[in-house]
From Swiss-Prot:
Keywords: Cell outer membrane, Membrane, Signal, Transmembrane, Transmembrane beta strand. Its main location: membrane. Residues 1 form the signal peptide. This is Opacity protein opA67. The keyword Heme does not apply.
Amino acid sequence: ASEGNGRGPYVQADLAYAAERITHDYPEATAQKKGTTISTVSDYFRNIRTHSVHPRVSVGYDFGGWRIAADYARYRKWNNSKYSVSIKKLQNQYNKKTENQENGTFHAASSLGLSAVYDFKLNDKFKPYIGARVAYGHVRHSIDSTKKTTGFLTTAGARGAAPTVSSPYKNTQDAHQESNSIRRVGLGVIAGVGFDITPNLTLDAGYRYHNWGRLENTRFKTHEASLGVRYRF
Protein backbone atom coordinates (compact mmCIF):
# COMPACT_ATOMS: atom_id res chain seq x y z
CA ALA A 1 0.00 0.00 0.00
CA SER A 2 1.13 3.57 -0.68
CA GLU A 3 2.35 5.67 2.19
CA GLY A 4 1.17 9.13 3.15
CA ASN A 5 2.37 12.37 1.55
CA GLY A 6 2.78 10.71 -1.86
CA ARG A 7 5.42 8.26 -0.75
CA GLY A 8 5.87 4.65 -1.80
CA PRO A 9 7.37 2.29 -4.37
CA TYR A 10 6.43 2.67 -8.03
CA VAL A 11 6.87 1.17 -11.48
CA GLN A 12 7.05 3.10 -14.74
CA ALA A 13 6.81 2.12 -18.41
CA ASP A 14 7.94 4.48 -21.19
CA LEU A 15 8.13 4.54 -24.96
CA ALA A 16 11.21 6.55 -25.92
CA TYR A 17 12.35 8.17 -29.16
CA ALA A 18 16.14 8.33 -29.19
CA ALA A 19 18.30 10.50 -31.45
CA GLU A 20 21.59 8.62 -31.51
CA ARG A 21 25.04 9.81 -32.54
CA ILE A 22 28.13 7.65 -32.73
CA THR A 23 31.45 9.23 -33.71
CA HIS A 24 34.61 7.41 -34.83
CA ASP A 25 38.08 8.90 -35.18
CA TYR A 26 39.18 6.82 -38.15
CA PRO A 27 42.51 7.46 -39.86
CA GLU A 28 42.20 9.78 -42.82
CA ALA A 29 41.90 8.12 -46.22
CA THR A 30 44.98 10.04 -47.41
CA ALA A 31 47.05 9.36 -44.31
CA GLN A 32 50.62 8.55 -45.30
CA LYS A 33 52.48 9.24 -42.08
CA LYS A 34 54.44 6.55 -40.36
CA GLY A 35 52.30 4.37 -38.17
CA THR A 36 48.99 5.38 -39.78
CA THR A 37 46.57 3.25 -41.77
CA ILE A 38 45.08 4.13 -45.13
CA SER A 39 41.31 3.99 -44.78
CA THR A 40 38.48 4.19 -47.28
CA VAL A 41 35.89 4.92 -44.61
CA SER A 42 33.77 7.88 -45.62
CA ASP A 43 32.77 10.82 -43.46
CA TYR A 44 29.29 9.32 -43.29
CA PHE A 45 30.60 6.45 -41.19
CA ARG A 46 32.72 8.77 -39.09
CA ASN A 47 29.65 10.63 -37.82
CA ILE A 48 26.58 8.41 -37.73
CA ARG A 49 23.29 10.10 -36.90
CA THR A 50 20.30 7.83 -36.58
CA HIS A 51 17.25 7.31 -34.38
CA SER A 52 15.16 4.57 -32.85
CA VAL A 53 12.02 3.95 -30.83
CA HIS A 54 12.40 1.60 -27.90
CA PRO A 55 10.63 0.67 -24.63
CA ARG A 56 12.02 1.41 -21.18
CA VAL A 57 10.96 0.07 -17.77
CA SER A 58 11.78 1.51 -14.35
CA VAL A 59 11.25 0.61 -10.71
CA GLY A 60 11.78 3.11 -7.94
CA TYR A 61 10.73 4.71 -4.71
CA ASP A 62 9.05 8.08 -4.19
CA PHE A 63 10.12 9.87 -0.99
CA GLY A 64 7.54 12.63 -1.42
CA GLY A 65 9.72 15.05 -3.38
CA TRP A 66 12.81 13.07 -4.21
CA ARG A 67 12.64 9.89 -6.26
CA ILE A 68 15.22 7.23 -7.01
CA ALA A 69 14.76 4.66 -9.78
CA ALA A 70 16.54 1.91 -11.66
CA ASP A 71 15.74 1.61 -15.37
CA TYR A 72 16.51 -0.76 -18.23
CA ALA A 73 16.28 -0.26 -22.00
CA ARG A 74 17.34 -2.04 -25.19
CA TYR A 75 18.01 -0.31 -28.49
CA ARG A 76 17.48 -1.49 -32.06
CA LYS A 77 20.30 -2.50 -34.39
CA TRP A 78 21.33 -0.04 -37.10
CA ASN A 79 22.61 -1.22 -40.48
CA ASN A 80 23.87 0.67 -43.49
CA SER A 81 25.49 -0.24 -46.79
CA LYS A 82 27.00 2.06 -49.41
CA TYR A 83 28.34 1.26 -52.88
CA SER A 84 29.73 3.65 -55.46
CA VAL A 85 31.61 3.39 -58.76
CA SER A 86 33.60 6.03 -60.59
CA ILE A 87 35.32 5.69 -63.97
CA LYS A 88 37.98 8.12 -65.15
CA LYS A 89 39.47 8.30 -68.63
CA LEU A 90 43.09 9.43 -68.75
CA GLN A 91 45.00 10.44 -71.89
CA ASN A 92 42.32 8.87 -74.11
CA GLN A 93 43.80 5.44 -73.51
CA TYR A 94 43.91 4.60 -69.81
CA ASN A 95 40.66 4.06 -67.94
CA LYS A 96 40.57 3.77 -64.16
CA LYS A 97 37.56 2.23 -62.40
CA THR A 98 37.21 2.76 -58.66
CA GLU A 99 34.68 0.81 -56.60
CA ASN A 100 33.87 1.61 -52.97
CA GLN A 101 31.88 -0.76 -50.77
CA GLU A 102 31.13 0.20 -47.17
CA ASN A 103 29.04 -1.70 -44.64
CA GLY A 104 28.31 -0.69 -41.07
CA THR A 105 26.35 -2.00 -38.11
CA PHE A 106 25.60 -0.25 -34.86
CA HIS A 107 23.91 -1.71 -31.82
CA ALA A 108 23.34 0.04 -28.52
CA ALA A 109 22.79 -3.31 -26.91
CA SER A 110 21.47 -2.22 -23.52
CA SER A 111 21.45 0.42 -20.83
CA LEU A 112 20.99 -0.16 -17.10
CA GLY A 113 20.71 3.06 -15.14
CA LEU A 114 20.16 4.56 -11.71
CA SER A 115 18.64 8.02 -11.39
CA ALA A 116 17.83 10.56 -8.70
CA VAL A 117 14.97 12.96 -9.48
CA TYR A 118 13.48 15.96 -7.69
CA ASP A 119 9.80 16.84 -8.27
CA PHE A 120 8.62 20.47 -8.11
CA LYS A 121 5.02 20.49 -6.95
CA LEU A 122 3.34 23.43 -8.73
CA ASN A 123 -0.17 22.30 -7.82
CA ASP A 124 -2.10 19.13 -7.13
CA LYS A 125 -1.67 17.88 -10.72
CA PHE A 126 1.51 19.15 -12.41
CA LYS A 127 4.99 18.26 -11.16
CA PRO A 128 7.99 19.33 -13.27
CA TYR A 129 11.17 17.50 -12.39
CA ILE A 130 14.92 17.45 -12.95
CA GLY A 131 17.48 14.81 -12.14
CA ALA A 132 20.76 13.06 -12.84
CA ARG A 133 21.46 9.56 -14.08
CA VAL A 134 24.40 7.18 -14.05
CA ALA A 135 24.19 4.11 -16.26
CA TYR A 136 26.13 1.07 -17.40
CA GLY A 137 25.82 0.83 -21.17
CA HIS A 138 26.88 -1.66 -23.80
CA VAL A 139 27.41 -0.50 -27.40
CA ARG A 140 28.68 -2.50 -30.39
CA HIS A 141 29.70 -1.26 -33.81
CA SER A 142 31.54 -2.61 -36.83
CA ILE A 143 32.76 -1.16 -40.11
CA ASP A 144 33.86 -3.07 -43.22
CA SER A 145 35.14 -0.85 -46.00
CA THR A 146 36.92 -1.77 -49.24
CA LYS A 147 38.27 0.24 -52.14
CA LYS A 148 39.06 -1.53 -55.41
CA THR A 149 40.85 0.18 -58.30
CA THR A 150 41.07 -1.47 -61.73
CA GLY A 151 43.03 -0.16 -64.73
CA PHE A 152 42.20 -0.84 -68.39
CA LEU A 153 44.31 0.01 -71.43
CA THR A 154 42.41 0.99 -74.56
CA THR A 155 44.16 1.07 -77.95
CA ALA A 156 42.78 2.47 -81.17
CA GLY A 157 41.83 -0.06 -83.85
CA ALA A 158 42.23 0.10 -87.62
CA ARG A 159 40.24 2.67 -89.58
CA GLY A 160 36.58 1.96 -89.05
CA ALA A 161 37.26 -0.73 -86.44
CA ALA A 162 36.31 -0.58 -82.78
CA PRO A 163 39.06 0.17 -80.24
CA THR A 164 40.61 -2.74 -78.36
CA VAL A 165 40.26 -2.94 -74.58
CA SER A 166 42.90 -5.11 -72.96
CA SER A 167 42.38 -7.22 -69.87
CA PRO A 168 42.86 -5.40 -66.57
CA TYR A 169 46.57 -4.96 -66.03
CA LYS A 170 46.38 -3.21 -62.70
CA ASN A 171 44.10 -4.24 -59.87
CA THR A 172 44.59 -2.96 -56.33
CA GLN A 173 42.38 -3.27 -53.27
CA ASP A 174 42.57 -1.56 -49.89
CA ALA A 175 40.46 -2.75 -46.98
CA HIS A 176 39.59 -1.30 -43.61
CA GLN A 177 37.83 -3.36 -40.96
CA GLU A 178 37.09 -2.35 -37.41
CA SER A 179 34.89 -3.63 -34.62
CA ASN A 180 34.56 -2.16 -31.15
CA SER A 181 32.47 -2.93 -28.11
CA ILE A 182 31.87 -0.31 -25.45
CA ARG A 183 31.04 -1.31 -21.89
CA ARG A 184 31.28 1.86 -19.89
CA VAL A 185 29.63 3.82 -17.12
CA GLY A 186 28.20 7.06 -18.47
CA LEU A 187 26.46 10.13 -17.06
CA GLY A 188 23.32 11.97 -18.06
CA VAL A 189 20.66 14.48 -17.09
CA ILE A 190 16.88 14.14 -16.90
CA ALA A 191 14.03 16.65 -17.11
CA GLY A 192 10.29 16.44 -17.64
CA VAL A 193 6.85 16.92 -16.21
CA GLY A 194 4.40 14.60 -14.52
CA PHE A 195 0.61 14.93 -14.54
CA ASP A 196 -1.33 13.10 -11.82
CA ILE A 197 -4.30 11.33 -13.39
CA THR A 198 -5.19 9.77 -10.04
CA PRO A 199 -3.38 9.87 -6.67
CA ASN A 200 -1.51 6.72 -7.73
CA LEU A 201 -1.25 7.06 -11.53
CA THR A 202 0.91 9.70 -13.24
CA LEU A 203 1.37 10.52 -16.92
CA ASP A 204 5.03 11.33 -17.55
CA ALA A 205 6.62 13.27 -20.44
CA GLY A 206 10.39 13.40 -20.19
CA TYR A 207 13.71 14.21 -21.83
CA ARG A 208 17.11 12.74 -21.09
CA TYR A 209 20.60 13.27 -22.42
CA HIS A 210 23.18 10.57 -21.90
CA ASN A 211 26.88 10.36 -22.70
CA TRP A 212 27.67 6.67 -22.89
CA GLY A 213 31.42 7.17 -22.50
CA ARG A 214 34.34 6.52 -24.83
CA LEU A 215 36.29 3.46 -25.89
CA GLU A 216 39.46 4.17 -27.85
CA ASN A 217 38.22 6.05 -30.95
CA THR A 218 34.47 5.75 -30.41
CA ARG A 219 32.07 8.17 -28.72
CA PHE A 220 28.34 7.63 -28.33
CA LYS A 221 25.64 10.06 -27.15
CA THR A 222 21.85 9.98 -27.13
CA HIS A 223 19.03 12.49 -26.77
CA GLU A 224 15.75 10.84 -25.79
CA ALA A 225 12.16 12.06 -25.55
CA SER A 226 9.72 9.73 -23.84
CA LEU A 227 6.09 9.35 -22.86
CA GLY A 228 4.98 6.92 -20.19
CA VAL A 229 2.91 6.16 -17.12
CA ARG A 230 4.03 5.76 -13.52
CA TYR A 231 2.05 3.79 -10.96
CA ARG A 232 2.75 4.21 -7.25
CA PHE A 233 1.74 1.39 -4.94
